[in-house]
Curated annotation (Swiss-Prot), chain A:
Keyword flag Lipid metabolism: no
Record's subcellular location: Cell membrane
Protein name from the UniProt record: Degenerin-like protein asic-2
Regulation of protein activity: Inhibited by the diuretic drug amiloride.
The organism of origin for this protein: Caenorhabditis elegans
């Protein structure tokens, strides 16, 4: 009886189920038809399973989509950092006792360039055949030597604000030293950053060169008395310019802009913002772990991560840190001796070697930042000063204007010539107020999965939410049947059906039809029709119940 | 001691046959004794001068020319002709005789009875009978008489006849004529006599009288008319002339003479010397002339002894010789033939011969006996074989003397004189004077002007010494010379140098001072023989100062010599100097890669050092050198052909490339206007063209270039058209990966190959035997390129985008070197060191950030997404699923079955 009950339940369910093919299987007239419908059911079920697999695989691959937006709005002016390409005043280096080691290095290097070598602690004599190697070792030695001198002791040789910046204006409004933040760079000495302090609120509401920052700089490679004031290792006369967003590292050693003397360098910048997705859709991180974060004072960038990784590699191989990069609290800087310089040299690119040194991309595990602002500069040049310009400046600490009252020069043309050899104008402005915002978002979300799943299920099986409810109902019915032991009747018994007057009426009609068909000789077709009608009526009665 | 000359040959006079002469007689001593010296003279055969009519045969002058070619003797059947020197002799053939040799021996004509000129014919082959056929002016039985009537003698139809024993002739005149030849009329007329001038009256004169009119009226005509009108009974005695009318009458017609002087003197129309009067006014009256018959004087038979038979009387005009003339018989003479004349042979005048009488003329002819000659045979024979020498012909004269008809070149009475100057032309160009020196004749030549030598056969050479200047060619001529001047000289003696430094007008009509100044105004021209020397200014060179120094430098740099075919092209170039950089590839493109590479820079020429990741690179190992036609030698870091690939491992300056280089401006070609290092940044598989994007690095500065990479990937197949490999397009000539630029240039080269039969040398060539365009073909390339336009729009040029490529955008900045580099501060010569230092530059290639953009084409809808959306839409809108389609199929099948059953019923 129990088995019969389950069969009955399934039969009833299949008659009203909304799942495709199931009613056809239950109501098949013969065995061949039933097998056919079962095969169809299996096929569509298999296709649905395959499509479901594809959808799940696609979802768990976490594809990302980059949306590009072009925004037009008021922007905060970027941080502009300027440094003299000559880090220290040579006249002070030669006279100040604190720079005696640097002076010795400069003298030894000068002699080496003309072929006069002597045994020195930096090992300049070892590169007597190659100019590049000599220059490279001398530059590294200078960084190491300068690192030994404290910031306080360096002050006399560093360029002050008055030495470097003769004029400053932003959007036509004069600015002052208080708008700049000074820091000491291991390569370039004193550097000044405009709009770095959070308390400043310089912003731009209109684009163009009229609404940017204008600086007149003097690098003083030659003093007014004609003496050269550049270090022997300095090859370029000009300023190093960095443009970056607030809070970011200037990265002057790697990514600065060269601005030469005798020119006005117009630097137009355009902003690009990147917003990246985190796991699992992206790999961005906000910061490095504290244990490996060497640039805690700056916003995280790929460059800071790579620099930290390189510093760790340097410490591991040379047992000392490179002062060009940030030092940890427990790290010791390399000493300006031949051994350390040789070790630093071996860390430079040697890809053709059988044992190449560190590959930052492969070995550092650096991830891009989740939020990044990048300024792309475009430089154009003009001559400075023009032949008729008398170089007006409000600064009184520097050389002054090229007027007849200036006693530092014998004539106006001499003054203009000095500015042509030692001065420049820097103009930094926003090219346009519009900027591009790239936002990385999830490309395939749960909503997409549900949409695709609904489509596939609907196409292959005709499944819908109703079908799920039906399945649930079926489970409840089967559960109830098991609990009650089959006492619940789902349908009337055969005896009760026979006693029903409506059934009797149908049987009477059936007899009459059979009788008529006999007369016409169409017995078989008439029987088929009757059977169908009976079944249909039975279904209706069941539904009504 | 006597000297005797003896001829060496029987031929005279000099030994040549047929009396030939010798131009150079030789004498040979034969013997010499105390008494006499004997010389034998002769002639060398080569020196024989043949007389006219003789030619050389087996021996010189031994052949006499044929003179009988045209049968001068007559009919060859009867005559036998023998040739002689310039003449011939005639004789009768055997069996014939007579003057014409036509008479056979033994016949009647053998004795020549007929007169000379007549033809004798035998009669019936008898020995006695003959007949003489006379010539037209002969008559008589033996034609012995001359026929005087053979020529017309008589006039006015007179009849000529021989009379008085055929010794004379006479004309029988018709009536009205008289005279010996009937030339005189037989009447005597008197002229009209002028009578007077009278008034004309038509009523009495013109109406009734006999008259005729004539516009050319004369008195004689009127007189003749009167004679015609006269008859035996009526005689017209008066002539009345009124204008053009002639009126004749027996008596006078008018006698009115009033006022006649003013009107009568009108001249006749036919004769101005006569007067005819004026019609209607005046008439001239003449008395008519008369005509009388002249009497015949021969009616008297006593005249001319006609009655005696001694002559004949001829009627003549009465006023001439008494009206008659006499023709006497041969033996009679006198006015009336009354005097007898004896016969000519009586007595006989022939002294030594027989007298023959001519009856017609009563003349005699003497037939001399042998040994005598002359008219009367009074002279003995003189001519013998020795009389005339050397072939001369002896003729006896009537006066008893003789005459020798000498052959040519012989003179003298006996033909003994030879004039040496008459044969052989010893003096060709001069006057010859003959002298006699022994047996041999000699001569002296007086030469004409311009000739010299013994025989005046040598023309004086006026070219020795050479009168022409400057070694010009002297051609001698008669009495002078001609100088053929070498080019650049003129004058009779070529002594004048033609000045080539003269002004002239050029093709545009502008006057040019000298040929040297066509381009260079500062040039100086110096003349020379067929040349000129130009001293050029400082900007021009070459022979005529028409070659710009710059052009010469260019040609020397390119070819090593001045190529004349390129000068005009380069002159045009000077008007537009910017073209020269475009033209150089057409010249260097002809060189091989190795030759071009040698012309250009080496790595050591340009690089002081180059470093990557702060590590110095090896120039030979890490820098790949290759050559481009336009760019020259290029040096590529990380080239695709190198075994090792450098990877970018860190960002920033220390992770990029730095190079310290030299521009070497001191070795620049003169047509380059800027100095820089061109930097190309590209994917390693891309090929660099001369037009690829580049960045200039300036001397005396460091140029920093920041590069940003963008990668593009495209979908192929049904999503679009892209190319993965060069083999997917029709032609691709360049190494490396496929690029759109390379494909377009390949199309361009194919077009150039089609249009100009060569390829543009500014791009690499297709493999095979395709030639590069030369400089002369540059115009074809330019024209074809402009006509063709943009290759991307050609229908046969299909150049899709590559399926994957990378692009690099660059931003740059620049800073100058310091004014006093440390190496120059230590140098002894600061200015030279600085000048050398500012020629150098530094290039820095930096990747500021390691991230880059990828633009990837993704299908907007794939198959799975399509199924998902299709299922969703069908399910939402119609509740359809896959099984629904099967159910519909079953429904259709059922309906079909039902219809079949119904149809079956």
């Amino acid at each position: 009886m129990r088995g019969g009950g389950f069969v009955q339940i399934f039969k009833d369910f299949s008659n009203w189920s909304t799942v495709a093919v199931v009613p056809h299987v239950a109501n098949a007239n013969n065995k061949i038809s039933r097998i056919f419908w079962i095969a169809i059911f299996l096929f569509v079920l298999g296709m649905f399973a395959y499509e479901l697999y594809i959808l799940i695989a696609k979802f768990f691959s976490y594809p990302a989509t980059v949306n590009t937006e072009i925004l037009f709005e008021k922007q905060i002016f970027p941080v502009v950092t300027v440094c003299n390409m000559n880090p220290y005043k040579y006249s002070v280096v030669k006279s100040n006792s604190a720079f005696s080691s640097v002076n010795t290095l400069m003298t030894t290097y000068s002699d080496a360039t003309v072929g006069t070598f002597s045994t020195d602690k930096w090992g300049l004599y070892a590169d007597n055949d190659e100019t590049y190697d000599l220059d490279s070792r001398a530059a590294d030695a200078l960084v190491l030597e300068a690192n030994l001198i404290s910031d306080t002791a360096k002050v006399p040789a560093l360029y002050t604000y008055a030495d470097l910046i003769q004029d400053c204006s932003f959007a036509g409004i004069p600015c002052s030293e208080s708008d700049f933040t000074k820091f000491i760079d291991p390569v370039y000495g004193a550097c000044y950053s405009f709009n770095e302090d959070a308390s400043l609120n310089y912003s731009v509401s209109r684009e163009g060169i009229q609404f940017g920052l204008k600086l007149m700089l003097t690098v003083t490679q030659t003093k007014t008395n004609g003496n050269t004031d550049s270090l022997p290792t300095t090859k370029l006369a000009g300023a190093r310019i960095g443009v970056n967003s607030r809070g970011s590292s200037p990265g002057l050693d790697s990514n600065g802009i060269d601005a030469g003397v005798g020119y006005e360098s117009a630097v137009s910048v355009s902003l690009t913002q990147n917003v990246r997705a985190k796991k699992p859709y992206g790999t961005c991180v906000d910061r490095e772990p504290d244990s490996s974060d060497y640039y805690k004072d700056f916003i995280y960038t790929l460059e800071t991560c790579f620099n930290g990784c390189k510093q760790r590699d340097t410490i591991a191989k040379c047992q000392c840190a490179n002062p060009r990069l940030a030092l940890g609290s427990t790290d010791t800087a390399c000493q300006p001796i031949k051994a350390d310089l040789d070790c630093l040299q071996t860390l430079k690119g040697n890809q053709t070697s059988s044992t190449p040194n560190i590959d930052l991309l492969v070995e550092c595990n650096c991830n891009p930042p989740c939020d990044e602002s990048t300024y792309t500069p475009t430089v154009s040049l003009a001559q400075f000063p023009s032949t008729s310009y008398y170089v007006a400046t409000s600064s009184t600490a520097g050389v002054g204007s090229c007027s007849s009252t200036n006693s530092k020069f014998s004539s106006k043309s001499d003054c203009q010539k000095w500015y042509n050899n030692n001065g420049m104008i820097i103009q930094v402005f926003l090219e346009t107020l519009s900027y591009e915002l790239y936002t990385e978002t999830a490309g395939y979300t749960v909503s997409n999965v549900i949409n695709d799943l609904g489509g596939q299920a609907g196409l292959w099986l005709g499944l819908s939410v109703i079908s799920v409810v039906e399945m649930t109902g079926l489970m409840l019915v089967m559960g109830a049947f098991c609990v009650t032991g089959g006492a619940i009747k789902m349908a009337p018994d055969d005896d009760e059906i026979e006693n029903d007057h409506r059934i009797k009426d149908v049987e009477d009609v059936k007899k009459e039809i059979d009788h008529l068909e006999k007369k016409h000789g169409e017995m078989e077709s008439g029987s088929d029709g009757e059977v169908d009608d009976i079944e249909n009526k039975g279904d209706e009665e069941k539904k009504k119940k | 001691q006597t000297v005797e000359y003896v001829p060496a040959s029987i031929n005279g006079p000099h030994g040549c046959a047929n009396y030939g002469l010798c131009t150079d007689v030789t004498t040979t001593l034969v013997s010499s004794t105390n008494i006499s010296v004997i010389y034998e003279y002769g002639c060398d055969p080569d020196n024989c001068y043949c007389l006219e009519g003789t030619t050389n045969g087996t021996e010189p002058c031994d052949t006499i020319e044929d003179q009988c070619g045209n049968n001068p003797c007559g009919d060859p059947k009867y005559f036998l002709c023998t040739s002689k020197i310039k003449s011939y002799s005639c004789s009768c053939k055997p069996g014939f005789t007579g003057n014409d040799c036509k008479s056979e021996l033994g016949s009647a004509c053998a004795t020549s009875p007929c007169r000379s000129g007549a033809t004798c014919e035998s009669v019936d082959n008898s020995t006695a009978g003959y007949k003489c056929i006379c010539k037209w002016n002969q008559m008589g039985e033996n034609c012995e008489y001359d026929n005087f009537c053979a020529n017309p003698q008589c006039q006015n139809n007179g009849n000529c006849s021989m009379v008085v024993d055929n010794a004379n002739w006479i004309c029988s005149c018709p009536p009205g004529w008289q005279g010996r030849r009937c030339e005189t009329p037989d009447t005597v007329t008197t002229p009209p006599v002028w009578d007077g001038c009278y008034k004309y009256n038509f009523q009495s004169i013109g109406a009734t009288t006999t008259k005729f009119s004539d516009n050319q009226l004369t008195v004689d005509k009127c007189n003749k008319y009167a004679l015609q009108q006269s008859s035996d009974t009526v005689t017209m005695n008066y002539l009345t002339l009124c204008g053009g009318f002639c009126m004749v009458s027996e008596g006078p017609l008018c006698n009115d003479t009033s006022n006649w002087d003013d009107d009568c003197k009108k001249k006749c129309g036919g004769n101005n010397n006569e007067f005819c009067g004026v019609l209607n006014k005046r008439c001239i009256v003449y008395e008519a002339g008369t005509a009388e018959v002249d009497e015949n004087a021969c009616d008297n038979s006593t005249f001319c002894s006609a009655d005696l038979g001694q002559g004949l009387c001829i009627n003549w005009q009465s006023d001439f010789t008494d009206g008659y003339a006499c023709i006497c018989k041969p033996l009679w003479t006198g006015r009336n033939c009354e005097n007898p004349v004896p016969e000519a042979c009586t007595p006989s005048p022939c002294l030594n011969g027989t007298c023959v009488l001519n009856d017609q003329y009563n003349k005699f002819t003497c037939v001399c006996d042998d040994g005598f000659f002359g008219d009367k045979c009074q002279y003995s024979d003189i001519c013998t074989s020795a009389t005339c020498l050397y072939g001369g012909t002896c003729t006896e004269l009537n006066n008893g003397d003789y005459k020798c008809d000498c052959l040519l070149q012989y003179f003298g009475k006996n033909c003994e004189v030879i004039n040496r100057c008459d044969y052989g032309k010893p003096c060709n160009n001069g006057k010859c004077a003959s002298t006699i020196d022994g047996i041999t004749t000699n001569y002296t030549c007086t030469c004409d002007d311009g000739w010299t030598g013994t025989n005046c056969d040598t023309m004086i050479d006026f070219c020795i010494p050479n009168p022409c200047s400057y070694n010009s060619t002297c051609k001698p001529k008669f009495k002078g010379y001609d100088c053929t001047c070498i080019t650049g000289l003129t004058g009779v003696n070529c002594s004048t140098i033609i000045d080539l430094c003269v002004p002239y007008k050029d093709s545009t009509g502008k006057w040019i001072k000298t040929p040297c100044n066509s381009k260079d105004d500062m040039a100086n021209c110096t003349k020379g023989i067929n040349t000129l020397t130009c001293s050029c200014g400082d900007k021009w060179t070459d022979t005529l100062c028409d070659l710009n120094i710059l052009i010469k430098d260019v040609l020397m740099a390119i070819y090593g010599y001045v190529d004349l075919t390129m000068i005009s092209l380069l002159n045009d170039l000077m008007q537009n100097p910017s073209q020269i950089k475009d033209m150089v590839p057409f010249i260097t493109g002809l060189l091989t890669d190795s030759e071009r590479s040698d012309l250009s820079w080496d790595a050591g020429d340009l690089f002081n050092w180059i470093a990557f990741e702060d590590q110095r690179l090896d120039l030979n190992r890490d820098i790949h050198k290759w050559n481009d036609v336009v760019l020259g030698n290029c040096f590529t870091f990380n080239h695709r052909d190198r075994n090792f690939t450098y990877r970018l491992r860190s960002s920033g300056r220390h992770g990029g490339i730095q190079a310290f280089m030299k521009t070497r401006q001191d070795e620049y070609a003169p047509w380059y206007d800027t100095a820089a290092i061109n930097v190309f940044i590209h994917n390693r598989d891309d090929y660099v063209f001369s037009e690829s994007v580049r960045y200039n690095a300036q001397p005396n500065a460091q140029s920093t270039m920041n590069i940003f990479m963008t990668r593009y990937t495209r979908l192929g197949g049904r999503y679009g058209k892209c190319v993965k490999k060069p083999s997917e397009v029709k032609n691709y000539y360049y190494p490396g990966a496929y690029t759109t630029d390379g494909c377009l240039r390949t199309c361009y080269q194919d077009r150039m190959k089609q249009e100009c039969n060569c390829m543009d040398p500014r791009y690499p060539q297709a493999p095979g035997n395709v030639t590069s365009c030369q400089l002369s073909e540059r115009s074809c390339v330019t024209v074809a390129s402009e006509a063709a336009g943009d290759p991307s729009k050609w229908w046969d040029c299909v150049c899709p985008l590559p399926c994957s490529n990378q692009e690099y955008s660059v931003t740059w900045s620049k800073a100058n070197f310091v004014n006093l580099p440390i190496i120059c501060g230590k140098s002894s010569d600061v200015s030279t060191c600085k000048a050398h230092y500012i020629d150098q530059l530094m290039v820095s290639i930096v990747l500021p950030q390691l991230d880059f953009k990828i633009y990837a084409e993704n299908p907007a809808m794939d198959f799975n997404k399509f199924l998902s959306q299709l299922g969703g839409q069908l399910g939402v809108l119609m509740g359809i699923n896959l099984v629904t389609f099967i159910e519909v199929v079953f429904l259709l099948f059922g309906l079909f079955t039902l219809c079949c059953k119904k149809y079956g019923k």
